[in-house]
A protein has these predicted regions:
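Catalytic domains of carbohydrate-active enzymes, especially glycoside hydrolases
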Residues: 23-32, 36, 49-82
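N-terminal small/glycine-rich loop or linker at the start of catalytic domains
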Residues: 27-47, 108-122, 154-160
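Glycine-rich, aromatic-flanked loop segments that form ligand/cofactor-binding clefts
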Residues: 27-37, 80-110
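Active-site beta-loop-alpha junctions enriched in small/polar residues
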Residues: 35-37, 79-83, 107-112, 155-157, ...
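Short, acidic/polar
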Residues: 49-66, 132-140, 235-244
Length: 392
């Protein structure tokens, strides 16, 4: 018997519908970010890598390779103006030809020097108007690309008490976003992301899930909260936030990454895999369709394509563990008030080696049993480095 045979026999003995679990794994759609394939770094410096993509088209090529190896990374999220081209339709056609589709479109309201005091919260109405124009432009770009979501993260905030009026900033933001939301076509949703701090260090205008949720309620039904795993204070119970937003039908999606201290953008599941498992327990347990699953990471010292492949595999395995949780036993333990029995149900699933299950799902999709090993054995990194040139 194979490892997969042994695992499925054990799981079926526990009452797990293995076929349904594998079908759910095959149906995963994970968006990888175009910006995650290019040069990135910290405020201390950037370490260029040989073979780094020089254009958005090469970033799409890298995303297509991740999808080929993993089978479930069939969407690529884009960032504008980072991914701007002269002909948006040409980019759309290239993405389709690569076997991908466009995920969320991410506007950039944090790099232009005009936004030093904020974008849609800026005291200057001319700068707010400039920010709105970019947001409206991204809606049209998304329409051409076939994207169904705008993913908004605002860096807006203040560094010192007294710098600006906190409530007036909030009202400026809602006023601008209301106009932008009104221009949103029916096929697009608005994902509103929050972050506790950075680059603002005194007050961030969208600092937590509550402030983001309140803005979404002001905007409309197609405005939902996007949860970035690294945008919380230390020790925050992210899975509880997920469960509340999902129950309110306001969970729009995720930016998956991992953290040790702040917004570290490490490989998802690398530092705290149990947290990732618990998040998927809430998602799978809700019984509804999964929200948008996007990776948002900054690979500063690691090989970028390999890091992205590992990230997708970690998400697949976390989802697989959540799918084999004995829900009946969990509910029974809860009803009986048996604290540790319920905890043990989750530990049983978490400690199960689900890699054969994930590999079987990938195999059915024509992907690799072991994507990281397959990538390393392929020699692609060396070929691409030779084609694209040295980093220096």
């Amino acid at each position: 018997m194979t490892e997969h045979d042994h695992l499925t026999a054990r799981l079926r003995g526990r009452g797990v519908d293995v076929d349904a679990a594998e079908a759910a794994l095959r149906s995963l759609v994970i968006e990888t970010p175009s910006w995650g394939y290019g040069d990135s770094g910290t405020r201390f410096g950037v370490f260029p890598q040989a073979g780094r993509p020089r254009t958005v088209f090469e970033r799409v090529d890298d995303a297509a390779e991740v999808h080929r190896l993993t089978g479930t990374a069939g969407a690529v999220a884009l960032h504008f103006p980072w991914d701007a081209v002269g002909d948006v339709q040409e980019l759309a056609d290239y993405i389709t030809a690569a076997g991908l589709r466009v995920g969320a479109v991410n506007p950039n309201l944090f790099q232009d020097p005009d936004y030093v005091l904020g974008s849609v919260t800026n005291p200057d109405p001319a700068i707010r108007s400039k920010a709105e124009s970019h947001l409206l432009e991204c809606i049209e770009i998304a329409r051409t690309l076939g994207s169904t979501a705008q993913s908004l993260w605002l860096a807006d905030g203040t560094n010192y008490p007294g710098q600006d009026h906190l409530i007036e900033r909030r009202e400026r933001m809602i006023d601008s976003l209301t106009r932008v939301y009104a221009a949103l076509p029916a096929e697009q949703e608005y994902l509103v992301e929050y972050k506790l701090f950075e680059p603002a260090f005194y007050a961030t205008d969208l600092a937590d899930w509550g402030s983001a949720l309140l803005v979404c309620r002001r905007l409309g039904e197609r405005a939902r909260v996007l949860v970035d795993m690294g945008h919380h204070a230390q020790g925050v119970n992210v899975e509880q936030i997920v469960s509340i937003l999902a129950s309110e039908d306001r969970l729009g999606g995720f930016h998956f990454n991992n953290r040790k201290y702040a917004d570290d953008d490490l490989i998802v599941g690398s530092v705290n895999p149990f947290e990732l498992f618990l998040v998927f327990c809430e998602l799978v347990g809700s019984g509804g369709p999964l929200p948008r699953l996007t990776i948002d990471q900054s690979h500063n010292i690691e090989a970028k394509v390999e890091a992205m492949v590992m990230s997708v595999v970690n998400i697949q395995d976390a989802c697989a563990r959540a799918l084999i949780v004995d829900r009946a036993a969990l509910r029974a333990a809860s009803a009986d008030g048996d604290v540790l029995a319920g905890h043990q149900v989750l530990l049983d699933a978490y400690n199960t080696d689900v890699r054969p299950l994930s590999a079987s799902a990938r195999r059915a999709l024509g992907a690799a049993d072991d994507p990281v090993a397959a990538l390393r054995a392929s020699g692609r990194a060396e070929r691409v480095a030779a084609e694209r040139g040295d980093a220096r």
